[in-house]
Curated annotation (Swiss-Prot):
Gene3D superfamilies: Cytochrome b-c1 complex subunit 7. GO terms for biological process: mitochondrial electron transport, ubiquinol to cytochrome c. InterPro entries: QCR7, QCR7_sf. It comes from the Eukaryota. It is found in: Mitochondrion inner membrane. The keyword Transport applies. It is a peripheral membrane protein. It comes from Bos taurus (Bovine). Component of the ubiquinol-cytochrome c oxidoreductase, a multisubunit transmembrane complex that is part of the mitochondrial electron transport chain which drives oxidative phosphorylation. This is Cytochrome b-c1 complex subunit 7. Belongs to the UQCRB/QCR7 family. The keyword Membrane applies.
C-alpha cells in the first residue's frame, strides 16, 4: 500500500509535464490538434483519406486557419486555444488500421 500514493503522485507529475509541453509546443495557440501536426507519410495520407467527411473538413479548416494566423504572425484569443483535455486523437484509429493493413500486405508479399 505504501507504493500506491507514490505511483499516483508520479502519474500526476507526469500529466503535469504533458500539459506543460502541450502548451509549450504552441500548436494549440493556432487552434490545431496533435493529429493535425503529424508528419504526412504514405500511411498518414491514407488514414487522412479514410476520415469521415466532417472530420476531414474540420482538419482542413484548422490547418488553413493556422496557416493564415502564422502568415499574419498572430495567435488565437486564449479562449479559442485547443485545450489539452479537448484534444482527441481523431486520426489514430484510422492510422492504426492502415499500418496493420500495410504490415499484412508485406507479410503476404514475403510468402
Amino acid at each position: 500500500m505504501a507504493g500506491r500514493p507514490a505511483v499516483s503522485a508520479s502519474s500526476r507529475w507526469l500529466e503535469g509535464i504533458r500539459k506543460w509541453y502541450y502548451n509549450a509546443a504552441g500548436f494549440n495557440k493556432l487552434g490545431l490538434m496533435r493529429d493535425d501536426t503529424i508528419h504526412e507519410n504514405d500511411d498518414v495520407k491514407e488514414a487522412i483519406r479514410r476520415l469521415p467527411e466532417n472530420l476531414y473538413n474540420d482538419r482542413v479548416f484548422r490547418i488553413k486557419r493556422a496557416l493564415d494566423l502564422s502568415m499574419r504572425q498572430q495567435i488565437l484569443p486564449k479562449e479559442q486555444w485547443t485545450k489539452y483535455e479537448e484534444d482527441k486523437s481523431y486520426l489514430e484509429p484510422y492510422l492504426k488500421e492502415v499500418i496493420r493493413e500495410r504490415k499484412e500486405r508485406e507479410e503476404w508479399a514475403k510468402k
